[in-house]
């Protein structure tokens, strides 16, 4: 699973954005990424749901060239396991301490840094969809309870 993070260290990559394949891009995310690209910050973190409580989610971050030139070495030195949540541990232990002062965080639940555009109903960045393009109803209910 960690191979998908390796382009962050490649010389020919100016910007790398990591997303999960079961999520859909939306305008809220577009506006957030646009704001980050216009900033002087090397790393971007988004958290847009009450369950997005980790420092960095494996499918909701981006980095600019030169921010993590040793990403491959960091991955190789991390004791990898092929289990759910291992990427959260990797980002918490190996990445976040290195980028926490060089990142733009869009997160309305934990850090108070709002997204540049308003929420569209119950849509959120990182929203999961299945093979039938159906979202997870439990995720929507949790979000509804938190935003009123």
Residue ranges and their predicted role:
Residues 15, 41, 58-61:
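Small-molecule pocket liners
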Residues 21:
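Active-site acidic catalytic loop and adjacent metal/ATP-binding pocket
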Residues 1-5, 30, 87-89:
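Conserved glycosyltransferase catalytic-site signature
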Residues 9-11, 37, 53-55, 135-136:
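Extracellular/periplasmic catalytic domains that process cell-envelope and extracellular macromolecules
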Residues 1-15, 24:
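Active-site-proximal specificity loops/subdomain of glycosyltransferases
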């Amino acid at each position: 699973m960690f191979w998908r993070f390796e382009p962050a260290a490649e010389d020919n990559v100016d910007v790398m954005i990591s997303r999960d394949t079961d999520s859909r891009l939306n305008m809220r995310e577009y506006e957030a990424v646009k704001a980050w690209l216009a900033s002087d910050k090397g790393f971007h973190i988004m958290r847009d749901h009450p369950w997005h409580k980790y420092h960095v989610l494996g499918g909701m971050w981006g980095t600019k060239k030169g921010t993590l030139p040793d990403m491959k070495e960091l991955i190789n030195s991390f004791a990898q396991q092929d289990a759910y949540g291992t990427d959260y541990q990797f980002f918490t232990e190996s990445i976040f301490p290195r980028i926490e002062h060089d990142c733009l965080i869009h997160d309305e639940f934990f850090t108070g840094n709002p997204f540049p555009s308003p929420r569209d109903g119950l849509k959120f960045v990182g929203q999961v969809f299945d093979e039938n393009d159906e979202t997870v109803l439990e995720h929507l209910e949790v979000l509804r309870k938190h935003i009123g």
